[in-house]
Amino acid sequence: MASLQRKGLQARILTSEEEEKLKRDQTLVSDFKQQKLEQEAQKNWDLFYKRNSTNFFKDRHWTTREFEELRSCREFEDQKLTMLEAGRGVGNCLFPLLEEDPNIFAYACDFSPRAVEYVKQNPLYDTERCKVFQCDLTKDDLLDHVPPESVDVVMLIFVLSAVHPDKMHLVLQNIYKVLKPGKSVLFRDYGLYDHAMLRFKAGSKLGENFYVRQDGTRSYFFTDEFLAQLFMDTGYEEVVNEYVFRETVNKKEGLCVPRVFLQSKFLKPPKNPSPVVPGPGS
């Protein structure tokens, strides 16, 4: 099993079979069921973690390779980095970062109370180096847990796709309040025409590029245009916004699985310096 990766600014081109499948799957889940899924979103994610414990997602050691902001504090011993991992699940990004770098302090939150408890039970959990709390980023104020404009970097890794598109801007507004001016949100999530999107059966579609899994959890598949507009409408500036294409090849079984992610960086604009008021006689 091997993985090949490349990056690009254009969306993946579908095969004719894939295009035909998506054209056929136009029937949307009923409004009643959609409302029920929204009301039960937290319960469905909590049940997901109950079923899978800490075993579903692999630890993510690629974050420092892809995002230089997570490496910068290693250059000087006394340089500290305060980060927020929003929707961090059971700590698959959090703990590798804390283990690799003693100069990081992390705030971390998740929608699921069960996921938060799993993090607190991890042997690497240290209250001196991280603060973990339960939070619905669409309605719970991060300022109840994190001081305003105190965070150097926010990680939004495979989180926003689980939020209803109508509420995504609320997440971005929430994290904007705790991010320092001139600092970044690091984003990675499912991209348009990812293999997971093409595998959904008929009757799973909630809206444009938005689907429900059999367990009731939902997933949105991003275009670069949609994401850029979402961030910029909330006051951020685009720095990087590109597709990541990965092909997982199993030569023995003759399989090639096309994965598509969107990897991006958006900046909270720096504060303008106060204008210098000329003194008398100047």
UniProtKB/Swiss-Prot annotation:
Catalytic reaction(s) noted: cytidine(32) in tRNA(Ser) + S-adenosyl-L-methionine = N(3)-methylcytidine(32) in tRNA(Ser) + S-adenosyl-L-homocysteine + H(+)
Superkingdom in the source lineage: Eukaryota
GO molecular function: RNA methyltransferase activity; S-adenosylmethionine-dependent methyltransferase activity
Subcellular location: Cytoplasm; Nucleus
GO BP terms in the entry: methylation; tRNA processing
Binding site for S-adenosyl-L-methionine: 45, 49, 87, 110, 136-137, 157
Principal localisation: cytoplasm
Keywords noted in UniProt: Cytoplasm, Methyltransferase, Nucleus, S-adenosyl-L-methionine, Transferase, tRNA processing
Family matches, as InterPro entries: Methyltransf_12, METTL2/6/8-like, SAM-dependent_MTases_sf
Biological role stated in the UniProt entry: S-adenosyl-L-methionine-dependent methyltransferase that mediates N(3)-methylcytidine modification of residue 32 of the tRNA anticodon loop of tRNA(Ser), including tRNA(Ser)(UGA) and tRNA(Ser)(GCU). Interaction with SARS1/SerRS is required for N(3)-methylcytidine methylation.
Description of how the protein assembles with itself and partners: Monomer. Interacts with SARS1/SerRS; interaction is mediated via tRNA(Ser) and is required for N(3)-methylcytidine methylation.
Protein name according to UniProt: tRNA N(3)-cytidine methyltransferase METTL6
Species: Pongo abelii
